[in-house]
Design a protein with these regions (language model features):
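Cysteine-centric segments in proteins
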Residues: 1-87
């Protein structure tokens, strides 16, 4: 589930895990998430904190910002104006 700036994506994703808990999600049914990103990567910076970026079809790796792990749902990462959950 991705919520960002008024758009949402709730559907199946390809989930790829990297070292240290960093992960990337890519939508399966459509080319992009609602906000135009082809993939979203949550880079772990330290325990409970991450930097989130979205890759656009034009190849721009846009910085979404800092996120913290949700206390209510540990599958979710919450930023200032976005939430990324990987179930």
């Amino acid at each position: 589930m991705i919520d960002s700036e008024g758009t949402s994506y709730r559907g199946p994703c390809q989930y790829n895990v990297a070292r240290g808990g960093t992960f990337t999600v890519t939508p399966l049914r459509s080319r992009t998430f609602g906000g135009g990103a082809m993939s979203i990567t949550v880079f772990m910076t330290r325990r409970g904190y991450a930097e989130v970026r979205g890759l656009t079809p034009e190849g721009i790796n846009s910085r979404w910002g800092r996120a913290v792990r949700s206390r209510r749902d540990s599958a979710c990462w919450v930023g200032e104006d976005f939430t990324v959950c990987a179930y």
